[in-house]
């Protein structure tokens, strides 16, 4: 008989695995084996007094050898049971139940059942010495207990199943019931099978967005705050640092932009002008260097020729006079010299004639006549034609040389790349590039409104008349009449052929192609750019002809007669049908 405060001492049935022995434990005992005498009083699950030894050993639940597994005791008992005798039948418990199986002969109202046929409702479903049937409802499914001998499938919402134990000996899952804190009686074990590793979905900054609270549903959450979406979360420090660096960089760039915007562009324009002037000077210097190079080459050739002539003269002098008939070099030298003198004399003659003409002009003081100007222009034109012919011949020679050079590279160097293609492409880009103007253009891109209106009027007048065409004028007839009707025939307060100030429909909400309120709506979508109210095809104060192509500006053309009625939909009050003649020739 266990006296005092005992916590979970006892055996399960006839099977004694605890190392405590069979003597009665006195005082505060934690996990020692008690004798088979029944406990009396308030006892937290002493597993004593086995009536009939059980044939099958099962682990009882408790913080030791068994917390809730004993025979029926008198008094207040939390889960008393007869460890050996399994309960035969008991009524199914409904509602919130810990699922510890009420014993067969227990009549205590506070006994938590151990063996039950079916537990429906919210149960914690611990498997003790009994054989539970199918449990339906919300169950934690063997939270911390070993599976019994025969366990059927649990239907319903299960939060557990076979989870892995969180420790070695403390939360083990063997089938033998041992005493102490590390046994497989109702210990704090979360399951029996191996853990399964799930791949974590990490988002920006290493945050697992799959565990966010916005993925939860209101139906599955037991608390109302579980279904609230998380609006603001703190970013990781790495991303915060990057954002701060980016903001600092943007701020610095804005400061640089402000400094640049405060600077004047005159200095840059002056530098640009200086660069242009330097380019011109460089081109002049390059042309001068080219001329000097040609002159140097020419002087080199002349110097070599003079050295040759001097050597010939020296040898001629040393040659005896009797052998001079075989020496033809002096004759060639004198012949070339005479030809040069002839060319120089012709140049001198031309220059002398020009000088005489100039002196004669200065002496006579005669004014230049238009014939002289025309003759000078003709001579300049002939000079340009001759230069163009020479340039064309030079261009053809350059093309031939380019082809020869490319053939040489392809033949001897094995390089078929056109080396002149890059320069040709650059020149083409330079030609096709638009010239950037430094200021607004003095010529407007918009056409003249008066010219467009005149052209529209002439075009309309040249077309054959297909109906009553109102003339250009001022009238309070057709356009000003506020007709109540639909169609293309105008109806108003005056005659229809008196013209009008841009004879389109009058003040009102027209039904010919218009859907909103407007000051004059026409029936053709190809009208001019008009100003006014409304959102139809061509709406507003349209002083143009909508029958022609679209023109820009405020034009004073002639429009097709279109009525304006105080109606926006179908035919409300049609006063007169349009005649068939007005529809001829229209597209």
Swiss-Prot record:
PTM entry text: O-glycosylated.
Record protein name field: Nucleoporin p58/p45
Signal peptide: none
Region named Disordered: 196-236, 565-587
One BP annotation, GO: nucleocytoplasmic transport
Source organism, top-level taxon: Eukaryota
Principal subcellular localisation of the protein: nucleus
Sequence repeats by residue range: 7-8, 30-31, 44-45, 63-64, 68-69, 476-477, 480-481, 501-502, 507-508, 517-518, 519-520, 533-534, 556-557, 566-567
Membrane spanning stretches: none
Compartments where located: Nucleus, Nuclear pore complex; Nucleus membrane
Coiled coil regions, renumbered to chain: 244-264, 302-369
Function: Component of the nuclear pore complex, a complex required for the trafficking across the nuclear membrane.
Span list, region 14 X 2 AA repeats of F-G: 7-567
Extra remark: In rat, the p62 complex contains two different isoforms of NUP58. Isoform p45 has however not been isolated in mouse so far.
Topology term for the membrane: Peripheral membrane protein
Family, similarity comment: Belongs to the NUP58 family.
Modified-residue entries (Phosphothreonine), positions: 319
Pfam families, alphabetized: Nucleoporin_FG2
Species the sequence originates in: Mus musculus
Comment, domains: Contains FG repeats. FG repeats are interaction sites for karyopherins (importins, exportins) and form probably an affinity gradient, guiding the transport proteins unidirectionally with their cargo through the NPC. FG repeat regions are highly flexible and lack ordered secondary structure. The overall conservation of FG repeats regarding exact sequence, spacing, and repeat unit length is limited.
């Amino acid at each position: 008989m266990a006296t005092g405060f005992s916590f979970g001492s006892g055996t399960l049935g006839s099977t004694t695995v605890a190392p405590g022995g069979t003597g009665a434990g006195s005082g505060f005992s934690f996990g020692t084996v008690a004798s088979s005498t029944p406990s009396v009083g308030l006892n937290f699950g002493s597993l004593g007094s086995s009536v009939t030894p059980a044939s099958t050993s099962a682990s009882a639940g408790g913080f030791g050898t068994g917390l809730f597994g004993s025979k029926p005791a008198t008094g207040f008992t939390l889960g008393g049971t007869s460890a050996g005798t399994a309960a035969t039948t008991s009524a199914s418990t409904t509602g919130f139940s810990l699922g510890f199986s009420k014993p067969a002969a227990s009549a205590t109202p506070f006994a938590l059942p151990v063996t039950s046929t079916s537990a429906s409702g919210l149960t914690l479903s611990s498997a003790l010495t009994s054989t539970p049937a199918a449990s339906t409802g919300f169950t934690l499914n063997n939270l911390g207990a070993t599976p019994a001998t025969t366990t059927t499938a649990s239907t319903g919402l299960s939060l557990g199943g076979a989870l892995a134990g969180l420790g070695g000996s403390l939360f083990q899952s063997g089938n033998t019931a041992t005493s102490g804190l590390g046994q497989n009686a109702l210990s704090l074990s979360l399951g029996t099978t191996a853990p399964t590793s799930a791949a974590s979905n990490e988002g920006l900054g290493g945050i697992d967005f799959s565990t966010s609270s916005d993925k939860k549903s209101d139906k599955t959450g037991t608390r109302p705050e579980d279904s609230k979406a998380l609006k603001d979360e703190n970013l990781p420090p790495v991303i915060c640092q990057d954002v701060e660096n980016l903001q600092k960089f943007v701020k610095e760039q804005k400061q640089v932009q402000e400094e640049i915007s405060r600077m004047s562009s005159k200095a840059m324009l002056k530098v640009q002008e200086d660069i242009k002037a330097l380019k011109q000077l460089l081109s002049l210097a390059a042309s001068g260097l080219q001329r000097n190079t040609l002159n140097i080459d020419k002087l080199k050739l002349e110097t070599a020729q003079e050295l040759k002539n001097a050597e010939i003269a020296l040898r001629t002098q040393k040659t005896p006079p009797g052998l001079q008939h075989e020496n033809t070099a002096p004759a060639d030298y004198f012949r070339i010299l005479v030809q040069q003198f002839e060319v120089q004399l012709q140049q001198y003659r031309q220059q002398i004639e020009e000088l005489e003409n100039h002196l004669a002009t200065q002496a006579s003081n005669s004014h230049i006549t238009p014939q002289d100007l025309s003759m000078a222009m003709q001579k300049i034109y002939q000079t340009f034609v001759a230069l163009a012919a020479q340039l064309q011949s030079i261009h053809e020679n350059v093309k031939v040389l380019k082809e020869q050079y490319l053939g040489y590279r392809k033949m001897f160097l094995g390089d078929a790349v056109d080396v002149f293609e890059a320069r040709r492409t650059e020149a083409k880009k330079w030609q096709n590039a638009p010239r950037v103007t430094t200021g607004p253009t003095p010529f407007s891109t918009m056409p003249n409104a008066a010219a467009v209106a005149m052209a529209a009027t002439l075009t309309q007048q040249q077309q054959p008349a297909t109906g009553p065409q109102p003339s250009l004028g001022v009238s309070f007839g057709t356009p000003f009449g506020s007709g109540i009707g639909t169609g293309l025939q105008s109806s108003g307060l005056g005659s229809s052929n008196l013209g009008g100030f841009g004879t389109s429909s009058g003040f009102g909400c027209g039904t010919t192609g218009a859907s909103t309120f407007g000051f004059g709506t026409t029936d053709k979508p190809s009208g001019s750019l008009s100003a006014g109210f409304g959102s139809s095809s061509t709406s507003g104060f349209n002083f143009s002809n909508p029958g022609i192509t679209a023109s820009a500006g405020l034009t004073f053309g002639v429009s097709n007669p279109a009525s304006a009625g105080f109606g926006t939909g179908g035919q409300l009050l049609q006063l007169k049908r349009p005649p068939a003649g007005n529809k001829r020739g229209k597209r």
